[in-house]
Amino acid sequence: MNVQKPEGKDTTLTTTDGIAARLGGSPGLIVQEVGWDEDCDSTLSEAIEDAIGSELLDEDSYEICDIVLLWWRSDDGDLVDGLVDAVRPLADTGRVWLLTPGNGRSNALAPGDIAESAQLAGMVQTKAERFGDWQGSCLVRRGNKQ
């Protein structure tokens, strides 16, 4: 969504601060990114990096983190396994942002599949957000509603 600035320049409301706020990114948080590939929206990754003031941890890191950005497509395998793996480096109060292709896109996941997989992985969905062509589902450990 674009708005006109007084001086006539377009600015996108879904960039840096807006995206970071919706994902819960803030200075000092540790964020790991898993499953990134060429089809992903790098704007999300860059917005989080700007908000936290550091680079994202890659998927091979074993550092405890506050947020995991998990890019997932229907052909990536078993989502339950992916979620269980994503929870391992997560702090007790952390959250996983599951980012899947939006409805109607190739490799999209049905909302029911996400809910069922989250439940089987011991997680619950606390909110959903649309980020361009990607659908975001915020997941936390069961009993840790944020």
Task: Give a label for each model feature.
Residues 2-146:
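S-adenosyl-L-methionine-dependent methyltransferase catalytic core, i.e., the SAM/SAH-binding region
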